């Protein structure tokens, strides 16, 4: 079990897939995304991400037919006027969970069910999980209104997240997102229509 502080300053790469990888968000034509009405809903909500919290910067993003990628920067606490650079040395320290006396700081310790539940409750209140929960809920609700399918699950339950710890990784991920429509036919999820 990964124990991270998802409110810590840093850079986060997030991917969220449509349930069963259905191509409902649009299609790629001439290496550009052409949004369906459902894709437009997701695009609109992605662009609202910075409104969710003053520390959030939506650095890069792309919506593809059956998933989206986000590159989100959480600024330093109390720092609201720019993008901070990745500090390779301190990035790991930022994400070590801050309850050093608890089980998650002890290597090879097997947590109890209660301890895992405690961490899960804390995690739900962290910025990134809260943001993703709101994004999934709002887009699903609006898509279901258009489809006349209330309560339908549109997103996979969990999303993939990666804390970026190196400047080189940040640059590679940013370029990957930018070039995703051009490389759509080589994408892992391309053939899962």
What are these regions (language model features)?
Residues 1-193:
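Short catalytic/metal-binding and nucleic-acid-binding patches
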């Amino acid at each position: 079990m990964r124990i991270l502080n998802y409110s810590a300053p840093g850079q986060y790469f997030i991917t969220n897939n449509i349930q069963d990888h259905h191509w409902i968000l649009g299609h790629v034509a001439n290496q550009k995304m052409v949004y369906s009405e459902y894709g437009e809903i997701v695009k609109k909500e992605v662009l609202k991400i910075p409104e969710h919290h003053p520390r959030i910067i939506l650095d890069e993003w792309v919506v593809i037919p059956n998933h989206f990628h986000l590159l989100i920067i959480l600024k330093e606490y109390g720092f609201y006027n720019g993008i901070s650079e990745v500090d390779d040395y301190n990035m790991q320290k930022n994400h070590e969970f801050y309850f050093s006396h608890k089980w998650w700081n002890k290597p090879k310790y097997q947590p109890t069910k209660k301890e895992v539940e405690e961490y899960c409750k804390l995690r739900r209140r962290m910025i990134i999980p809260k943001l993703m929960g709101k994004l999934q809920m709002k887009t699903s609700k609006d898509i279901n209104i258009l489809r006349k399918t209330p309560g339908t699950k549109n997103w996979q339950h969990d999303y993939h997240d990666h804390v970026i710890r190196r400047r080189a990784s940040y640059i590679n991920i940013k370029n990957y997102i930018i070039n995703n429509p051009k490389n759509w036919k080589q994408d892992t999820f391309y053939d899962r229509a």
